[in-house]
C-alpha cells in the first residue's frame, strides 16, 4: 500500500465495466485502501451499461457511489455541434471523435468529485497515448487542486499476463476472449468508432475488413443512391427530411444513413500530441455527412472574408481539441468567433448518399448571399456593370506591375 499521507481517500474513476477499468478499480482499493466512486458515461457507444453497475457492486463499491449517466444529448449539443460549427478536422481528415468525448467525461468526474467530496480522479488511459493528456488537462482546467491517478503510469504490472494474474487473484471476471491478446483496441461513442494497435500496427498492411464495425463496405452498399435533406438553424442541424430531431437523435439517424451507404471510413497515420505517430482506423458515418452538409449551407450564407478567416482558424481550433485544450481560454475565444459567424447559417442542404460518398447536390437559405440576378450569364438588366472590373483589376495589378518593371530592368535576384 502507498504512503498513507499521500494516498487519496476517495477517488472518482472513469469506469467502463471492462476488464482494464475493473482491474484499476480493485487496484485502487488494494494500493490505497481508498473509497472508489465509479462514473460510467453513455456516450452512445452502443453497449449495455447496467452490467457496469453489477461489476462495481461486486467489487465492493457502495450503491450510492455508482454513477451511470446518459449524456448523449449533452455530448452532441454542447461538444459535437460546437465543434462542427467550426468544420473542425485534425490534419485535414480526422473528425476528432475520440478527442471531443474526453472533455465531457472529465467535466462529469470533477462535478461528481465535488458532489461526493472526493479528493482524486482516475482514468484508464495508457502512458503512450493522447487520452491521458486530454483527461488530465480537463481535470486541471476545472479543478487546479485535484489529485490525478493514472494507473498505467504508476503501477508495477509489466505485462498483460501480470494484469490477468491480478484479476484472477481478486476474483475479477475475465472473458475468454480476453485471455489472449485482443486483435485491436476500440473506442466508440455516438460520433465515431476508432480501432488501433496490434493487427493495425503495420501501416503498410490494409486493415482487415472485420475492423470496421460501424459501416458496411462501400462495395457492399446499395446500388441505388439515397437523397436526404438536412435543415440547419444558426449552424446546427435540427431536422432531416423535414422531421425535427434532438441533437443526439439527429446524429443517430445520420449514423444509420452513413452505415447503410458505407460512408465515413478513414485509415489515418496521425501525429500524436505526445510525439509519436500512430495508425487509427476511424468510422464517422453521420459526422462525415454532417460536415459536408454544414459546409454546404455555409457556402450560401457566409461572406467570403468570414468564410476564409474561419478556414484559417479551423486548424488551430482542431489542434486544441485534439491536444486536450477544450477548457482553455484560447479555445473559448475561437468558439466565440465561430459561433458569431453562424448567426445566418440557416437553411436546407440536399445530400446524395452513394457507396462511401456523401455528395452535396443542393442548398437553399432565406439568408443566402447568392444572387442569381447578379451572377447570371444572361442579361442582368444593369445589376452588374462589367466595365467596373477594369479599374478593379488595374488597382490590384499595381504592385505586380511595379515589381515586374523592376525585374525587367535589373533582372531577378
UniProtKB/Swiss-Prot annotation:
<comment type="similarity">
    <text>Belongs to the argininosuccinate synthase family. Type 1 subfamily.</text>
</comment>
<feature type="binding site">
    <location>
        <position position="124"/>
    </location>
    <ligand>
        <name>ATP</name>
    </ligand>
</feature>
<feature type="binding site">
    <location>
        <position position="94"/>
    </location>
    <ligand>
        <name>L-citrulline</name>
    </ligand>
</feature>
<dbReference type="InterPro" id="IPR001518">
    <property type="entry name" value="Arginosuc_synth"/>
</dbReference>
<dbReference type="InterPro" id="IPR018223">
    <property type="entry name" value="Arginosuc_synth_CS"/>
</dbReference>
<feature type="binding site">
    <location>
        <position position="131"/>
    </location>
    <ligand>
        <name>L-aspartate</name>
    </ligand>
</feature>
<comment type="pathway">
    <text>Amino-acid biosynthesis; L-arginine biosynthesis; L-arginine from L-ornithine and carbamoyl phosphate: step 2/3.</text>
</comment>
<feature type="binding site">
    <location>
        <position position="282"/>
    </location>
    <ligand>
        <name>L-citrulline</name>
    </ligand>
</feature>
<dbReference type="GO" id="GO:0000050">
    <property type="term" value="P:urea cycle"/>
</dbReference>
<keyword id="KW-0028">Amino-acid biosynthesis</keyword>
<keyword id="KW-0055">Arginine biosynthesis</keyword>
<dbReference type="Pfam" id="PF00764">
    <property type="entry name" value="Arginosuc_synth"/>
</dbReference>
<dbReference type="GO" id="GO:0000053">
    <property type="term" value="P:argininosuccinate metabolic process"/>
</dbReference>
<feature type="binding site">
    <location>
        <position position="99"/>
    </location>
    <ligand>
        <name>L-citrulline</name>
    </ligand>
</feature>
<dbReference type="GO" id="GO:0006526">
    <property type="term" value="P:L-arginine biosynthetic process"/>
</dbReference>
<protein>
    <recommendedName>
        <fullName>Argininosuccinate synthase</fullName>
        <ecNumber>6.3.4.5</ecNumber>
    </recommendedName>
</protein>
<dbReference type="InterPro" id="IPR024074">
    <property type="entry name" value="AS_cat/multimer_dom_body"/>
</dbReference>
<dbReference type="GO" id="GO:0005524">
    <property type="term" value="F:ATP binding"/>
</dbReference>
<feature type="binding site">
    <location>
        <position position="194"/>
    </location>
    <ligand>
        <name>L-citrulline</name>
    </ligand>
</feature>
<keyword id="KW-0436">Ligase</keyword>
<comment type="subunit">
    <text>Homotetramer.</text>
</comment>
<dbReference type="InterPro" id="IPR048267">
    <property type="entry name" value="Arginosuc_syn_N"/>
</dbReference>
<feature type="binding site">
    <location>
        <position position="130"/>
    </location>
    <ligand>
        <name>L-aspartate</name>
    </ligand>
</feature>
<feature type="binding site">
    <location>
        <begin position="14"/>
        <end position="22"/>
    </location>
    <ligand>
        <name>ATP</name>
    </ligand>
</feature>
<keyword id="KW-0067">ATP-binding</keyword>
<dbReference type="GO" id="GO:0004055">
    <property type="term" value="F:argininosuccinate synthase activity"/>
</dbReference>
<keyword id="KW-0547">Nucleotide-binding</keyword>
<dbReference type="InterPro" id="IPR048268">
    <property type="entry name" value="Arginosuc_syn_C"/>
</dbReference>
<feature type="binding site">
    <location>
        <position position="130"/>
    </location>
    <ligand>
        <name>L-citrulline</name>
    </ligand>
</feature>
<dbReference type="InterPro" id="IPR023434">
    <property type="entry name" value="Arginosuc_synth_type_1_subfam"/>
</dbReference>
<keyword id="KW-0963">Cytoplasm</keyword>
<dbReference type="GO" id="GO:0005737">
    <property type="term" value="C:cytoplasm"/>
</dbReference>
<feature type="binding site">
    <location>
        <position position="185"/>
    </location>
    <ligand>
        <name>L-citrulline</name>
    </ligand>
</feature>
<dbReference type="InterPro" id="IPR014729">
    <property type="entry name" value="Rossmann-like_a/b/a_fold"/>
</dbReference>
<feature type="binding site">
    <location>
        <position position="41"/>
    </location>
    <ligand>
        <name>ATP</name>
    </ligand>
</feature>
<feature type="binding site">
    <location>
        <position position="134"/>
    </location>
    <ligand>
        <name>L-citrulline</name>
    </ligand>
</feature>
<feature type="binding site">
    <location>
        <position position="270"/>
    </location>
    <ligand>
        <name>L-citrulline</name>
    </ligand>
</feature>
<feature type="binding site">
    <location>
        <position position="126"/>
    </location>
    <ligand>
        <name>L-aspartate</name>
    </ligand>
</feature>
<dbReference type="Pfam" id="PF20979">
    <property type="entry name" value="Arginosuc_syn_C"/>
</dbReference>
Amino acid at each position: 500500500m502507498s504512503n498513507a499521507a499521500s494516498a487519496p481517500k476517495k477517488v472518482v474513476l472513469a469506469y467502463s465495466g471492462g476488464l482494464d477499468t475493473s482491474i484499476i478499480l480493485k487496484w485502487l482499493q488494494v494500493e490505497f485502501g481508498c473509497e472508489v466512486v465509479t462514473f460510467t458515461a453513455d456516450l452512445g457507444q452502443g453497449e449495455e451499461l447496467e452490467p457496469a453497475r453489477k461489476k462495481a457492486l461486486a467489487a465492493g463499491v457502495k450503491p450510492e457511489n455508482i454513477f451511470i449517466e446518459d449524456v448523449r444529448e449533452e455530448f452532441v449539443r454542447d461538444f459535437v455541434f460546437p465543434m462542427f460549427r467550426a468544420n473542425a478536422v485534425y490534419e485535414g481528415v480526422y473528425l476528432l471523435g475520440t478527442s471531443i468525448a474526453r472533455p465531457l467525461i472529465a467535466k462529469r468526474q470533477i462535478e461528481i468529485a465535488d458532489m461526493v467530496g472526493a479528493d482524486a480522479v482516475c482514468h484508464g488511459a495508457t502512458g503512450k497515448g493522447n487520452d491521458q493528456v486530454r483527461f488530465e488537462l480537463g481535470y486541471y482546467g476545472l479543478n487546479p487542486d485535484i489529485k490525478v491517478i493514472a494507473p498505467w503510469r504508476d503501477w508495477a504490472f509489466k505485462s498483460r499476463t501480470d494484469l490477468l494474474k491480478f484479476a484472477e487473484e481478486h476474483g475479477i471476471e475475465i472473458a475468454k476472449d480476453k485471455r489472449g491478446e485482443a486483435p485491436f483496441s476500440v473506442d466508440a461513442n455516438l460520433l465515431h468508432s476508432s480501432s488501433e494497435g496490434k493487427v493495425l500496427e503495420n501501416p503498410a498492411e490494409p486493415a482487415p475488413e472485420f475492423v470496421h464495425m460501424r459501416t458496411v463496405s462501400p462495395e457492399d452498399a446499395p446500388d441505388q443512391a439515397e437523397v436526404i435533406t438536412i435543415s440547419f438553424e444558426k449552424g446546427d442541424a435540427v431536422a432531416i427530411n423535414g422531421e425535427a430531431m434532438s441533437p443526439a437523435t439527429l446524429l443517430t439517424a445520420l449514423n444509420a444513413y452513413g452505415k447503410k451507404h458505407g460512408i465515413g471510413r478513414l485509415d489515418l497515420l496521425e501525429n500524436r500530441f505526445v510525439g509519436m505517430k500512430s495508425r487509427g482506423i476511424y468510422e464517422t458515418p453521420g459526422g462525415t455527412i454532417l460536415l459536408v452538409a454544414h459546409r454546404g449551407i455555409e457556402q450560401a450564407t457566409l461572406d467570403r472574408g468570414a468564410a476564409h478567416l474561419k478556414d484559417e482558424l479551423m486548424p488551430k481550433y482542431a489542434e486544441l481539441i485534439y491536444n486536450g485544450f477544450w477548457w482553455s481560454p484560447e479555445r473559448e475565444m475561437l468558439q466565440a468567433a465561430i459561433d458569431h459567424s453562424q448567426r445566418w447559417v440557416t437553411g436546407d442542404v440536399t445530400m446524395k448518399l452513394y457507396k462511401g460518398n456523401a455528395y452535396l447536390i443542393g442548398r437553399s437559405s432565406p439568408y443566402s448571399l447568392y444572387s442569381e440576378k447578379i451572377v447570371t450569364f444572361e442579361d442582368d438588366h444593369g445589376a452588374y456593370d462589367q466595365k467596373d472590373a477594369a479599374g478593379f483589376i488595374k488597382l490590384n495589378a499595381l504592385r505586380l506591375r511595379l515589381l515586374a518593371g523592376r525585374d525587367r530592368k535589373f533582372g531577378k535576384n
